[in-house]
Swiss-Prot record:
Subunit structure: Heteromultimeric protein consisting of LacA and LacB.
Top-level taxon of the source organism: Bacteria
E.C. numbers: 5.3.1.26
Cited PANTHER family: DNA DAMAGE-REPAIR_TOLERATION PROTEIN DRT102, RIBOSE-5-PHOSPHATE ISOMERASE B
Biological or metabolic pathway of the protein: Carbohydrate metabolism; D-galactose 6-phosphate degradation; D-tagatose 6-phosphate from D-galactose 6-phosphate: step 1/1
Matches recorded under HAMAP family: LacB
Keyword terms, alphabetized: Isomerase, Lactose metabolism
NCBIfam families reported in the protein's UniProt record: lacB, PRK05571.1, PRK08622.1, PRK12615.1, rpiB_lacA_lacB
Name recorded for this polypeptide: Galactose-6-phosphate isomerase subunit LacB
Annotated source species: Streptococcus agalactiae serotype V (strain ATCC BAA-611 / 2603 V/R)
Signal peptide: none
Length: 171
């Protein structure tokens, strides 16, 4: 399995630790940078990770910045990417099993290195569990990636709200 990993300058050492961990586990790593602590911008590396995954060069991706918010937003702009900002195992497993996430994002200043590697391993091992409901939801989310007139209409998500009101979704 190939895993793309990227970060900004704030968490380079965290990324290096993640890359080293993944390699010791036998995964092939595509290190998308950055490689030092010289100031840079997280969107560059979020985009690189997203493109590696979306193109099929990598199977999964990991993005890290200070809080995780910026780089996760950036990677989610790449068509075909479903990334979740996670800080715990439950969220990472849910993202993979229910939403077929292909990237996870971390805040290196928020989540410690040992916890990050545990979460990454849980994410890698989790398997997407397709259901009729989550397939439809994932398809609807994918429609947002491409501009179409319908997404500008106020009723774009009405079908899902109606299902919620009928009790078809459960928390």
């Amino acid at each position: 399995m190939k895993i793309a990993v990227g970060c900004d300058h704030i968490v380079t050492y965290d990324k290096i630790a993640v890359v080293d961990y993944l390699k010791t586990k036998g995964y092939e790593v595509i290190d998308c940078g950055t490689y030092d602590n010289i100031r840079t911008h997280y969107p560059i590396y979020g985009k690189k990770v997203g493109e590696a995954v979306a193109s099929g060069k990598a199977d999964l991706g990991v993005c890290i910045c200070g809080t995780g918010v910026g780089i996760n937003n950036a990677v989610n702009k790449v068509p075909g990417i479903r990334s979740a900002l996670v800080r715990d195992l439950t969220s990472a497993i849910y993202a993979k099993e229910e939403l077929n996430a292909n990237v996870i994002g971390f805040g290196g200043k928020i989540t410690g290195g040992l916890l990050m590697t545990d979460i990454i391993e849980a994410f890698i091992r989790a398997k997407y569990k397709p259901t009729k409901e989550n397939k439809v939801l994932i398809e609807k989310i994918a429609e947002v990636e491409t501009h179409n007139a319908h997404q500008e209409e106020n009723d774009f998500f009405t079908e899902f709200l109606d299902k919620w009101n009928r009790g078809e979704y459960h928390d």
